[in-house]
């Protein structure tokens, strides 16, 4: 029987497993440091079986919080579902401590039902479904105060016990940074024997350097985890005044913005989305604005075209 991991365990999938100072004194150190002795997490097989009919999984990541990653996830989902009506899309909200997709997709107050084949995700549109821990809380104001192992268990349940059915694309809305949730989902979904495009990532940022600093870390995280990066989306790139029509940079790109960073890190820039108050109001109300003609939807069209062409 394996002992519980130490507090600062790097994780069995890490290249540093069994080799860092936190591993000293752990009864499992010899197992973790020897690749021939590592035990496969039984959850991986359960996840693989449950996700066999999900063609593509797309992680929506951000280095910094507050850059609009969840909003971008919602906009991408809405636009893809509208422009590809014959395809099926799912959204998995794995921001365990801050689930926002139920509100953004207009599903607050919905309930998750259990069936013989597992949890049934909540239907948003004819070709969109959603699963979030927000559906399992008694109140939207409930705080989730969990350590890593419990988050890991919840993510494994979402991946292995939800009846996703046949999906062309599952978008996973993640928390900011590179934390337990990211390590868990990469461990369960990464399959080096699967087609390269079965799991990939998009990183969301804003133009200012304080956000780009953490995007560089996120890019390196993906590379270490062997997750292909489809590209970067620069959110809130500019603001056009509704009265005078002039455009302003709310977050000045002093170091060249996402374009310069993408060139430096050798990743594609998928496009830029403006700061649009109508998007904010629609997301708060859980409404779909992707049918409306605007700078935002024009930019979304170009971004979504690049996403779909990569699969």
From Swiss-Prot:
Cofactor or coenzyme needed: [4Fe-4S] cluster
Predominant place of localization: cytoplasm
Sections of the chain in a coiled coil: none
Keywords on record: 4Fe-4S, ATP-binding, Cytoplasm, Iron, Iron-sulfur, Metal-binding, Nucleotide-binding
Cofactor: binding details: Binds 4 [4Fe-4S] clusters per heterotetramer. Contains two stable clusters in the N-termini of Nubp1 and two labile, bridging clusters between subunits of the Nubp1-Nubp2 heterotetramer.
Keyword 4Fe-4S: yes
Entry's Gene Ontology BP terms: iron-sulfur cluster assembly
Residues reported in the UniProt entry to bind [4Fe-4S] cluster 1: 9, 23, 26, 32
Subcellular locations according to the entry: Cytoplasm
One Pfam family it belongs to: ParA
GO molecular function: 4 iron, 4 sulfur cluster binding; ATP binding; ATP-dependent FeS chaperone activity; iron-sulfur cluster binding; metal ion binding
Binding-site positions, ATP: 63-70
Sequence positions that bind [4Fe-4S] cluster 2: 241, 244
Cellular component aspect of the GO annotation: cytosol
Record's subunit section: Heterotetramer of 2 Nubp1 and 2 Nubp2 chains.
Family designation: Belongs to the Mrp/NBP35 ATP-binding proteins family. NUBP1/NBP35 subfamily.
Function statement: Component of the cytosolic iron-sulfur (Fe/S) protein assembly (CIA) machinery. Required for maturation of extramitochondrial Fe-S proteins. The Nubp1-Nubp2 heterotetramer forms a Fe-S scaffold complex, mediating the de novo assembly of an Fe-S cluster and its transfer to target apoproteins.
Name of the protein described by the UniProt record: Cytosolic Fe-S cluster assembly factor Nubp1 homolog
Organism encoding this protein: Drosophila grimshawi (Hawaiian fruit fly)
């Amino acid at each position: 029987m394996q002992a519980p991991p130490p507090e600062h365990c790097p994780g069995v999938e890490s290249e540093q497993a069994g080799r860092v100072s936190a591993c000293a004194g752990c009864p499992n150190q010899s197992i973790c440091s020897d690749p021939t002795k590592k035990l496969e997490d039984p959850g991986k097989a359960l996840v693989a079986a449950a996700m066999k009919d999900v063609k593509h999984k797309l992680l929506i990541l951000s280095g910094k919080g507050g850059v609009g990653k969840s909003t971008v996830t919602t906009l991408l989902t809405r636009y893809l579902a509208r422009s590809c009506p014959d395809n099926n899309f799912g959204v998995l909200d794995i921001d365990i401590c801050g689930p926002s997709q139920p509100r953004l997709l207009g599903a607050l107050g919905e309930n998750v039902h259990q069936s013989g084949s597992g949890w049934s995700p909540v239907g948003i549109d004819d070709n969109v479904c959603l699963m979030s821990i927000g559906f399992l809380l008694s109140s939207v104001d409930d705080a989730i105060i969990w350590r890593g192992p419990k988050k890991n268990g919840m993510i494994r349940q979402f991946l292995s016990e939800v009846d996703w059915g046949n999906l062309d694309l599952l978008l996973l809305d993640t928390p900011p940074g590179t934390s337990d949730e990211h390590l868990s989902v990469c461990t369960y979904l990464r399959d080096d024997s699967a087609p390269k495009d079965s799991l990939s990532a998009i990183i969301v940022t804003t133009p200012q350097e304080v956000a780009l600093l953490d995007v560089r870390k996120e890019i390196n995280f993906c590379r270490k985890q062997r997750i292909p990066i489809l590209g970067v989306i620069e959110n809130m790139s500019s603001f056009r005044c509704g009265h005078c029509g002039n455009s302003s940079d709310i977050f000045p790109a002093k170091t060249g913005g996402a374009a310069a960073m993408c060139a430096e890190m050798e990743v594609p820039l998928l496009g830029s989305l403006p700061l649009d108050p109508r998007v904010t109001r629609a997301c708060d109300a859980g409404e779909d604005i992707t049918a409306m003609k605007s700078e935002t939807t024009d930019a979304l069209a170009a971004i979504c075209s690049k996403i779909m062409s990569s699969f």
